[in-house]
């Protein structure tokens, strides 16, 4: 095994000297044994001349000193894969962090893998039911597709992801992989305890590199989670869900180490390799003829600016976008999905059918008309509208409230039991509201209910 010595340490970036002709390959993992018995993993990033490599540390470099011995493992970072990782919480290098003993994995995968070949890809377009009305109706997710949850701070991205994990595990008994990339440790802890309580933990693998971790871990933990998901797809022929919270932090971590690695910054100070790094990750998330990896990625939007290079680069890869809006959250409508801003590639009559498509378009049309009338209402008041427009506004407000829904994972906040609404129930409910069947019901009856029958029941108590 080749051995080198640390020659320089600058924050998370460590330079290591090796004998001439024994340089580790790019992306190979190096290991440092610390005096306290723990080890630190480094990943080779650059060759500087004949005898020196520049690496990025996956853990804090506290306690490292120049001259320490560094061992070349001769291969990239390996992630444990298979049934043994279900119900466990791992870090970026595959070590358990849940205090429940070693991981019983029969096999490991390199975290750097090439995307499936073109001939192995599946091109079938198929909808994936989530049980969340606003998503299933207006921006249906595709099986094996990529979906982005866009939103600023505190509009509900993580809660929506937790609800999706809950619905998939309970309704479809599918496997999920959750990669926590640079988010709050408290949220990871809450997620872990809620999964233990609800029993979905046995079908989920969790991989975390949170805010307190060095940028090396945050830039690689999404790849570790992806490798675990790829194993279930390629070797067990399963349909897997991959949740990444938050893909923006993946880019942010890359930009933190980029300058230390000596690269020139590009627009807004991001790394020049932004599009390449994002492409390498996103290209591996796909459906093959054997199985699929369906991904839902939370995307933090810095300062609510969708044109920032990080969210804009992610946009290009997505099949569906769910945009969470602060103005809708302020109305108290949760999930705070913007029905007019969110899109889906498969909202097409040839894929979802005419009934679904027509209902979705009618909902969008009535909401858009309401939006157009809001300026007039603000200036002149409701009384100045024509009778026809008054009816549009009344129905649109009911539709807007009916797009809200009580979540299983938010029962503690709302005091209401969660609801999973089947697609046909969703379509039926919205069709009836738009057709005017429920014009006599108060609009509050439609707020935080599941099916249209529940709204009718609720109206009786108001």
Curated annotation (Swiss-Prot):
NCBIfam families: atpD. It is found in: Cell inner membrane. It is a peripheral membrane protein. SUPFAM superfamilies: C-terminal domain of alpha and beta subunits of F1 ATP synthase, N-terminal domain of alpha and beta subunits of F1 ATP synthase, P-loop containing nucleoside triphosphate hydrolases. F-type ATPases have 2 components, CF(1) - the catalytic core - and CF(0) - the membrane proton channel. CF(1) has five subunits: alpha(3), beta(3), gamma(1), delta(1), epsilon(1). CF(0) has four main subunits: a(1), b(1), b'(1) and c(9-12). This is ATP synthase subunit beta. It catalyses: ATP + H2O + 4 H(+)(in) = ADP + phosphate + 5 H(+)(out). Belongs to the ATPase alpha/beta chains family. It holds the Pfam family ATP-synt_ab_N. One of its GO terms (molecular function) is ATP binding. It comes from Chlorobium phaeovibrioides (strain DSM 265 / 1930) (Prosthecochloris vibrioformis (strain DSM 265)). One of its GO terms (cellular component) is plasma membrane. Its main location: membrane. Keywords: ATP synthesis, ATP-binding, Cell inner membrane, Cell membrane, CF(1), Hydrogen ion transport, Ion transport, Membrane, Nucleotide-binding, Translocase, Transport. The gene is atpD. InterPro entries: AAA+_ATPase, ATP-synt_VA_C, ATP_synth_F1_bsu, ATPase_a/bsu_AS, ATPase_alpha/beta_chains, ATPase_F1/V1/A1_a/bsu_N, ATPase_F1/V1/A1_a/bsu_N_sf, ATPase_F1/V1/A1_a/bsu_nucl-bd. HAMAP family: ATP_synth_beta_bact. PROSITE patterns: ATPASE_ALPHA_BETA.
